[in-house]
Amino acid sequence: MIEQCQCCGSEIRRYKGTFISGPNYILSQDNRTVTKCSDNGWNANAIGSETIPLGTITIINFKIEKTVESYIMIGIAPKTIDQKLDVAYSKCGWYYYSYTGGLYCEPPLSYSNFKFRNDSQLPEGTIITLIVDTSIGKISYKINDSLIKTAYHVSFPESIVPCVILYNKGDSIRIIQN
């Protein structure tokens, strides 16, 4: 049975993908957990294995497994993102920063720590839910099941994927399925 939004009729999907391999991080055996394995720096851009279809609402749940300072960006990016790109959060995609509660994104918005949430530094065990409504170009977030507001209204390129950017060596985050 296909779940549909009662407001707009869009299909609601639970993300079933995993992470794909890339530079500066390692994956768990099931490819659901990504761990930064290189020196500290914004150069580990882990992307999802499945694209987010246009015309749907896709829900993706992440769990912060391990973190030093919560220097983790969670969002979406074009599937073509350069996984080695340094500071990709300001050049390619739309992100929530779990350390400050700020938003970061590519031009033309070019957010740089735009204050989105008042608290900061999300601890280990925090569940971050990313809700992507491609039918109306909306990106929203929940923190531990508490809905915060819509973060972005944007026009999506055709192929977008979940993207997590890790800074600290040893930090890890997991795609969880409900």
Q: Where do the language-model regions lie?
A:
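PRY/SPRY (B30.2) beta-sandwich protein-interaction domains
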Residues: 1-178
